[in-house]
């Protein structure tokens, strides 16, 4: 896969198709494969994605990760590719990065898609931040997955949102998650925008996708963007916990 360099860091990216440019950004702990597993090939769309800083095959530095930095990385990729106008979207953390990018570069973004937003002008819920911080603490340790199961917070995760357990355990098998473990502490404490007033300048077509029964991506976060982005359309998906295949098709 091709690489580009920004601020001394190499980023892995991929392009599929030759149509309208659509940059899609993955969630926390994931990688660019998500975009190509989610969207079918379409000759009318040029699907672009990158392993965001500290994810997949992309590098990172010692500085704190933030939505601002991730959005600047994504913008740097589009500048590198010579693409000056494009659609942008993302899942979870990627949705927040997409919103931040659209606010930073409203003159470049033709449209916005957010899928299961994980933060607004407020960070994740304190309970969820504690979950991710605990995972971050054990990722660099030997037998970290076992230590997580022995932590006092583990039963509350299992009781509140058992689906998160499988996600967290996968992190311990991912080299990028283990190497760049601090991202699981940094990002949940950050927020894509500082105030909802930043959204008033977004007049581009916006599609907001959400589903219920998701503690990490509460539906009220997506409704926040629906209320505060002028041209936003909203669609509620079937929750993955009810029908994962239908969720993916939608």
PLM features per residue range, with description:
Residues 2-59:
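Conserved HGGG/HGGXW glycine-rich cap/lid loop of the alpha/beta-hydrolase fold
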Residues 88-90, 115:
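Short beta-strand immediately N-terminal to the catalytic nucleophile in serine-hydrolase-like folds
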Residues 96-104, 109-139:
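Flexible "cap/lid" loop of the alpha/beta hydrolase fold
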Residues 202, 208-210:
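Short beta-strand/loop motif that positions the catalytic acidic residue
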